[in-house]
């Protein structure tokens, strides 16, 4: 079965047409993020041409703003009038809050009681009402669903939604605009909305593009589902890639991923830290753990070199919302192992 046939099979979930419509819908809101070449990853590590897609420079510091703005922009006037609600402790919260502010919609964000103060304040700064409820995300989500039902508010899901996936897929269109002959694209994965959208965009134009998902060894529900060919949960511990800390992937995103993604790479916590440090040190890029996953996969040597050598490769830096205390810890840890670390990016 060809990939073109498969993209038709998954079109009922999200299609190239949906992504092209999203591109027009969110153009007034988003920033077209830069694509820069990493000379070190290209010349010294892969012998290919490796480019970094900098979604850490997106408004709110994350790709999540794309999907949130597309979803909210497609709501009916009645839905907008009743307000929107989301459960999130991170990037999705800020994407929803900023979009609501720009469109003049009331937004409520329910966060776990343990949500970092910095993220609470950032979300409030965009004008959203923040409610702290629940000792874990599941409790937070359940409370959010109760509030939505009681008040008739529309839930904005962080990944398992057609419009959200389409919004994230606009990154794929930008990649093709910049490098029409791209061969390999490496994407961080949590719930799967990002890679589902990007894979749909890329494979619709060129089925031979090799798409690699990257997850932490500690949390990789989508990778587990992909290889077992069944929706599966996986979480053995927390991860520094907290933006991808999703135990069970989305049902819709999984359906797209299982058809359009080619493989998954799992990286260790230490490999993620190394990538964060190297991106800061050599490329002057501040990234959160999730945003460093693709670079970690390249530096780890776990990707078959046939997808890298003499190839045009894009590694997505998905976001840069990282606490300064975590940045400090990564730098300190990096200095402690400097004698044995050889990876640099630039």
UniProtKB/Swiss-Prot annotation:
GO terms for molecular function: L-serine ammonia-lyase activity; nucleotide binding; pyridoxal phosphate binding; threonine deaminase activity. Pfam families: PALP (PF00291). This is L-threonine dehydratase catabolic TdcB. The keyword ATP-binding does not apply. Disulfide bonds: none annotated. It comes from Staphylococcus aureus (strain USA300). Its cofactor is pyridoxal 5'-phosphate. Belongs to the serine/threonine dehydratase family.
């Amino acid at each position: 079965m060809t990939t073109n046939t498969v993209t038709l099979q998954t079109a009922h979930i999200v299609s190239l047409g949906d992504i092209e419509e999203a591109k027009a819908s969110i153009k007034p809101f988003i920033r077209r993020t830069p694509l820069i070449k990493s000379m070190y990853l290209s010349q010294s590590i892969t012998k290919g041409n490796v480019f970094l897609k900098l979604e850490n420079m997106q408004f709110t510091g994350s790709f999540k703003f794309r999907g949130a703005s597309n979803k909210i922009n497609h709501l009916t006037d009645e839905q907008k009038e009743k307000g929107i609600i989301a459960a999130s402790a991170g990037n999705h919260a800020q994407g929803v809050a900023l979009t609501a502010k720009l469109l003049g919609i009331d937004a409520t964000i329910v966060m776990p009681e343990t949500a970092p103060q910095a993220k609470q304040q950032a979300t409030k700064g965009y004008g959203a009402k923040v409610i702290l409820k629940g000792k874990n995300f599941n409790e937070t989500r359940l409370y959010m669903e109760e509030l939505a039902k009681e008040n008739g508010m529309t839930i904005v899901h962080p990944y398992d939604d057609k419009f959200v996936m389409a919004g994230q897929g606009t990154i794929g269109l930008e990649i093709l605009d910049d490098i029409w002959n791209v061969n390999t694209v490496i994407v961080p994965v949590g719930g799967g909305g990002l890679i589902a959208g990007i894979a749909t965009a890329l494979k619709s134009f060129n089925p031979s593009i090799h798409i690699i998902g990257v997850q932490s060894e500690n949390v990789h529900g989508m990778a587990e589902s992909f290889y077992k060919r069944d929706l599966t949960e996986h979480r053995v511990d927390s991860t520094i890639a907290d933006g991808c800390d999703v135990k069970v992937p989305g049902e819709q995103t999984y359906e797209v991923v299982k058809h359009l993604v080619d493989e998954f790479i799992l990286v260790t916590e230490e490999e993620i830290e190394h990538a964060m440090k190297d991106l800061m040190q050599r490329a002057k890029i501040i990234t959160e753990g999730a945003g460093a996953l693709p670079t970690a996969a390249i530096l780890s040597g776990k990707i078959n070199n046939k997808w890298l050598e003499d190839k045009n490769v894009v590694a997505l830096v998905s976001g840069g919302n990282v606490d300064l205390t975590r940045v400090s810890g990564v730098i300190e840890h990096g200095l402690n192992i400097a004698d044995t670390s050889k990876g640099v990016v630039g």
